[in-house]
Amino acid sequence: MLAGLDLDSIFSSLLSRGGECGELFFEEVRTLSVLLEDGRVERVLEGTDSGIGIRLVFREKTYYAYTTDRAGDAVLSLARDLSRYAEGGGVPVSLPASPTMAENPSPVRVPPSTRGIAEKVELVRTMDRVARGASRSVRQVRATYGEAERRIEVAYHPGVFAADRQTFTLLTVQCVAGNGSGLTMGYETGGGTAGWEFLEEVLPGTLAEKAAGRALRALSARRIEGGRMPVVLSSEAGGTMVHEAVGHGLEADLARRGMSVYRDSLGTRVGSPLVSIVDDATIPGKRGSFGIDDEGSPGRRTLLVSDGILRGFLYDRLLARKEGVPPTGNGRRESYRHRPIPRMTNTVILPGTSSPEEILRSVDRGLFVRKMGGGQVNTVTGDFMFEVAEGYRIENGRQGEPVRGATITGNGPEALGMIDRVGDDLGFGLGTCGKEGQGVPVGDAQPTLRFGPPFLTVG
């Protein structure tokens, strides 16, 4: 789409009074969502949104505007308006003549737009039917299907003109169970960057069974006695801890502003020698994967922590330029209405050599976490608190009775240092990460982990 505009005139106007960089970002997104609640299809929404964002950076300040009018005159007028924030002489424009299409790590075999609404409604009906069939104690079921087909083009001075297509599919199911002792909830989700073929791996009935089972088991669960104790995080728990307690602190903008516990730790030990962490946008099919980020930088695998030593941060183009380092492909934005900022993609603690069964057997008494819930993190201090959505007592090296209402508190670098067993498995989670009012799709992953002395605090 951008190739159809007079980019030379637009960029010449944008940079007519100077600027370190200028950018045009085009986005077109088609979305469809289906919501089923209380046994009824409540909503089927389909729509398309498109627009162009324009960015000017002058003396390290960012000026941003956007328009839904894709006509060349409208974009040129907006570029002229932004140029008024600069003061100085013009900048010679250097751009390729046409965009380079990114090599996407998740090629789509069956675009979801080629399948009918009835098939998509049947997916949520299946989740509702399976969840309710698990037990009469299942009181409520909320099931959703979502898809998005996103096309982006990025023209970035100096020297970048790139394009990408990204397809997302997602199923979620939430179950509420109840008896005389109260109400409990179970939640499960599945999907990623894939077309309709995602159903080869993500089975609606299986998601519903897991969500209903989690809610039902919680009905008979008891609270655990609090205190410091060994904690085993199953790979099934997903990477909530690495994303929240570690990943945000490694986004370069937070570190640069002094808002990260890791701000002065590059090259120093921040965790156990058993811990290595990467951020990887190139993993096929995962929710945080892409061919290019929202500044036109290729998606890549970035080493963050190697054998417990902090090796790097996550950069967008602007911060990388300020610090004299290469961008890491982490400049992301929610839409054309937003400026890009450093964000995670798929953040992963790499697998080790211990079997999950061996790790569990190594603990006499403690807490075994199968699913993490929500939580809070102070990125400045590294302190965190997470809820446990599904947990069990560890009794004599075995999974014991379920617990409810448990929390885990600790500190990011201290917790990484407590990891003394790392499993040879790997489990992925997915979600939408919020930061500065923007939500972007992300993935996270971890193997089974054991947190040893001085132990996390369980509440």
Kindly label every feature range from the protein language model:
Residues 1-459:
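N-terminal small-residue-enriched
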